[in-house]
Amino acid sequence: MKKLIIFIFLSLILFVACDKLNQEDYKKFSYDENISLYGTPENNQRNWNLSCDGSYCKITYSVGTPLKIHYKKELTLNEEEKKKTVTALIKGIKKGKDFSGTQDYSPTNHLLLSNNKEYHGKTENEEFYKILNELLGENYSNIIQRY
């Protein structure tokens, strides 16, 4: 039993160490959470984007085919906030909610860092929505309902 606990602990350390971020890695980044809703052909694409360049950051929400921006918010984040955000985004991509068995709902996500390292997923990144609520100062679903 002790060997199993030690193995799990070491595996977790290696998992966290693999994604150790340097400040230059997240100086500039862009994250997209795209959702395809196959039951509504006129507006079947929805996209959230969070991007930062230095301390300047922007959140956009786009709807439609082709995508058209309906909501935009600009904000500033310090280095510690950006590091926390990027770390949570990576965690969420790796552990996102899987909808592969669902035919009418298809989420995908993509994170691009300053060092050109990319993370991709075909899951709903629940960590992203927690971050989004915090940065928006309201629940993201309120914005979805408006558009």
Identify what each model region corresponds to.
Residues 19-40, 99-147:
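Short, well-ordered, aromatic-rich surface patches in folded extracellular/luminal domains
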Residues 46-52, 72-77, 109-111:
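Hydrophobic/aromatic beta-strand elements that line small-molecule binding cavities or substrate pockets
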Residues 7-13:
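Bacterial N-terminal signal peptides
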Residues 38-68:
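Post-signal-peptide N-terminal segment of Sec-exported extracytoplasmic proteins
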Residues 1-4:
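Positively charged n-region of N-terminal signal peptides that target proteins for export
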Residues 61-99:
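Mature extracytoplasmic domains of secretory-pathway proteins
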Residues 53, 76-84, 113-117:
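A short, structured loop/turn motif at beta-sheet edges
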Residues 15-17:
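C-terminal motif of bacterial Sec signal peptides marking the signal peptidase cleavage site
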